[in-house]
Regions:
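Active-site loop-to-helix "anion-binding N-cap" substructures in soluble metabolic enzymes
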Residues: 1-194
Length: 194
């Protein structure tokens, strides 16, 4: 099956609302004729509403950087999938390496979030990747395989077709080391074989 490329921009905890609007207006002007790839922007939550108003009239899709595994309720600081849908969010990043590392998000939690995303008809972008010590000790496939198995647990075949897997070579982020295209392709091939 042919796959259309997806380019997703995670703005992380950068960009004020005004800066987000400047950036998305620039993107819509510069990328208006691009049809070969699906483009997704994932601004900070504070800018979702304003960015949504702009991208709804374009081919750029709106994504969120995270979401709760829970529905609406007493979950301070969280955001439910149904809330994201109000802004026409179509994608959500789950299991990003920073959330796994700093918020101690487990594969089990990522799986719960993926199920919640699918229930709301939001496409999860599930991130997997290994640290430098795993890469250097030859554990890449073990680590990535474990993350895949746990993060995708219980998803149906149909849900799997609507789930995007993103490989993050965590070992190459801020270390001065660079992941070569060949190294990334090796992991992509492993992921596809799972």
């Amino acid at each position: 099956k042919d796959r259309k490329l997806i380019v997703a921009g995670n703005w992380k905890m950068n960009k004020t609302v005004a800066e987000s609007l400047d950036l998305v207006n620039h993107l819509t002007r510069e990328l208006a004729s691009v049809r070969e790839v699906d483009m997704v922007v994932c601004p900070p939550f504070t800018a979702l509403s304003d960015v949504a108003k702009i991208v709804l009239e374009t081919d750029i899709r709106l994504g969120a950087q995270n979401m709760s595994e829970n529905g609406i309720g007493a979950h301070t600081g969280e955001i439910a999938a149904s809330m994201l849908k109000e802004f026409s969010v179509r994608y959500v990043i789950l299991g990003h390496s920073e959330r796994r590392q700093f918020q101690k998000e487990s594969d089990e939690l990522v799986s719960k979030k993926a199920h919640a995303a699918h229930a709301a008809l939001i496409r999860p972008i599930v991130c997997v990747g290994e640290l430098l010590e795993h890469r250097e000790s030859g554990q890449t496939e073990d680590i990535v395989g474990t993350q895949l198995k746990g993060s995708l647990a219980g998803l149906s075949a149909e849900q799997m077709l609507e789930t995007i897997l993103a490989y993050e070579p965590v070992w190459a982020i801020g270390t001065g080391k660079t992941a070569s295209p060949e190294q990334a392709q090796e992991v992509h091939a492993f992921i596809r074989g799972q």
